[in-house]
Amino acid sequence: GRPLIVRRPGLAREGRAVCCGIPLPPPQGRLRIPVLVDWAAVRSVEAPPPLARCLEVAPESWQASLRALLAACATGDGAEPAVVGSLAWQWLTGLEYLREDSDADLVFAVGSRRALSVLDEVLAPWADRTDPRLDVEIRLAGDRSVAWREWRAGPPWLLVKSTAGVELAERTRLLEDVEA
């Protein structure tokens, strides 16, 4: 079997199948192939791998920065980033997904306002770094996520992604939904 990424469940057919996809690596054209999979054929459903497990396939030029990020996370609130995107696909498949200009796509789950504040402090030194550039999603209550750079910019409305779809939400409402 091959790893696949699951799309939003709302696109599934009557709960019997799930819409998935697989991105091809750059040498194979970076095509994104959609696949409809019967749930009975799914062997396992896994969370994105933690960054610490994916370091072995990260480019040498990223190593010091990513190790420093892990150390900063350990001294912050202990939130460990999960890896998605090209780094995750390279780790999962052993194929060359990373390019010279790839970002490190990470997801941090936060369960409280304090954790959100600490995460922003931990990530602040990486706001302008490019070794690699961090593309961070902050996973809030439920399965909703916002882009860290957008959150950090402080707009009153934010783009929120979830398994149900994409919407604009008021920042104050998002904060109300995060435990104090």
Feature annotation, model-predicted:
Residues 17-19, 101, 105, 133-135:
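Broad gene-expression machinery/nucleic-acid interaction feature
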Residues 126-162:
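Conserved catalytic core of two-metal-ion nucleotidyltransferases
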Residues 70-104, 108-114, 123:
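Active-site nucleotide-donor binding segment shared across nucleotidyl transfer reactions
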Residues 178-180:
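Extended catalytic-interface subdomain
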Residues 39, 43, 157-172:
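Mature, function-bearing regions of proteins
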Residues 21-23, 107-109, 137:
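Residue-level recognition of well-ordered beta-strand positions that form the cores
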